[in-house]
Amino acid sequence: MAVCLCALAQSATWAKVDLPDIFSDNMVLQQQTDARLWGWSEPGAKVTVGTSWSGNVVTVDADKNGKWTATVETPAASYAPQTLTIADKDGQVKLSNVLIGEVWFCSGQSNMEMPLAGFDNCPIAGANEVIATSAQYKGIRMATVEKNGQLSPVDRCQGKWKVCNPENSPRFSATAFFFARMVNSVLDVPVGIINCSWGGTMVEGWLPRDTVAKYPDIDLKRDIRKEEPHDWWHYLSPTLMYNGMLRPLEGYTIKGFLWYQGESNVGKHKTYAQRLKTMVDLWRKEWGQGELPFYFVEIAPFGKYEGRASAFLREAQYKAQSLIANSAMVSTNDLVEPYEAENVHPKDKRSVGSRLAYQALAKTYNIKGIEADCPAYKSMEVKGDTVVLSFVHADNGFNRMKGMEGFEVAGADREFYPAKAELMGKNQIVVVCDKVSSPVSVRYAFHDYSPGNVANLRGLPLVPFRTDDWDW
């Protein structure tokens, strides 16, 4: 009898409405929208969803596989804790301490993954103080998706919402946290972050199989690691992160995407911009929320001065902005100390997160007075042995008149030499080199590691550039 009762109790537990991890206590729902919820019950079962902020109850039917989907209308953002009650005939699940605010989906590789606690021998600047005081940010919540490479798309991934405090925050993505902190401070609303990232991944890892199968440089039989279990090195494979980490979250109602990736695509710059666009187009389509904003980070300087492979990747990232509507890139060219030259994980993530936040605040939330775009090359004019450069996003000038570093000039022989650069007028730069009498091309910070020192008046750095289209 005891065995039978136990079995019946267990059966009832299994039958109760089932939710994915992303719907948990402490979650943040996007404000003033129809927020999407889903889960599982018995096939054909009626499922009800009730909220503490409304007297309305939404009733939906589970499909033949037990999957159900519902939407609830959310109010304006508030720090007041809310509850959701989701029930079927066998029981109910109550989600507590739910906040209504702004939700952003963050993805990429290790520099997005990198937590406030840092990686081995790779610290985050100021982390101890940030972690110690993190409980004061009661409106910041983060769900960190566990790494999960899968050969085929799955319905579930692990990773529940956590409140911000010294116990939880060391595992929060540093870049995403600093983004959330800035947005929370300016808008004074709760901010939820879904961190779905995995160090070392290529852009192809976040795309589905049918898309990647069309790429001539990828052989799925060769490139997908099929051995079980799906271990840490599966980041090397295409499609696996899309299948196991991103696909289960598609449809969670968000405000936009943040992306920090590219180091693993160095050497593949000719295909990167288009593939990034393909990824963004696909994500937007599958989320079904229209042209969601997509703000992304230029990879930071790393490696040897002599190399240029990562410089070409940065150039591809900058070009991607013109391909992807409602997108913008933030530069990080000024954020790496000399001793970090061969460290792909620089310590300054506060500036990265803040620059992403400037983009969102200025362009998504329409906050006036915030500079968001880094100055960038527009055109050149050769006058004898001198080149006059013009720029966009530099209407108010630059941070220095002389002592500009990182410029090079080449003639028809394509040999580059360090050049002297000075401000002309308010927002043009004059470049000259005594070794090049007939200049053909100018480059700025166009090496694997070659930080420049030019920025606009708000401290946003000049994006690395070249005026030529040579292969190297």
Over which residues does each language-model region extend?
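Cell-envelope and extracellular/periplasmic
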Residues: 14-472
